Amino acid sequence: MAHIHNDDFEMAKSDPQALFAFRGTPRKVLFNPGDRLFRFTSQPQGTFRGNEIFSSPWWHAQSTFNAIVRTANATGNSVADAARSGLAVSPNWNPTMEWLVIIELTKPVYGWVGPARHQPVKDGDRSALFLGNADQAYVPGLATGGNGMSSPFANIYYYGSMMGV
């Protein structure tokens, strides 16, 4: 049987900040070829260098994207605002969230999925929080052997602007 990417990865021994990004303990999930993973990104601007595509381990599944769109429609907020709140993404990490990246897996990979932990709207000020609670996926090492725009485990399926959506 072929080795599955991240099969030997131990989330409990990973970066403590990654574990802290989840509300509770994330569950190990097998993503199969043909599965699509999503993430919102920001382009470089000022001192922000932009979000990398495959180098970042943070993604979410189609079901989370669908829930974000439903929330945006129900509240009248933009998809980016609904995503920022549900995924608890600080503007310091991703200032605009105006671009959507969808990748399609070409090989099976393991990831860890669970609800996003709340995060402060502004660093150091816990008086206002992004609530989180939307399922996020931590899938490390997708860029192994590739670069920021390619991966031996996935192809870019879609990369486009979310401005005005």
Regions found by a protein language model. Give the residues of each.
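Short amphipathic alpha-helical segments
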Residues: 1-8, 157-165
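Catalytic toxin/effector domains delivered as secreted proteins or via bacterial secretion systems
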Residues: 16-164
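N-terminal low-complexity, Pro/Thr/Ser-rich intrinsically disordered segments
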Residues: 1-23
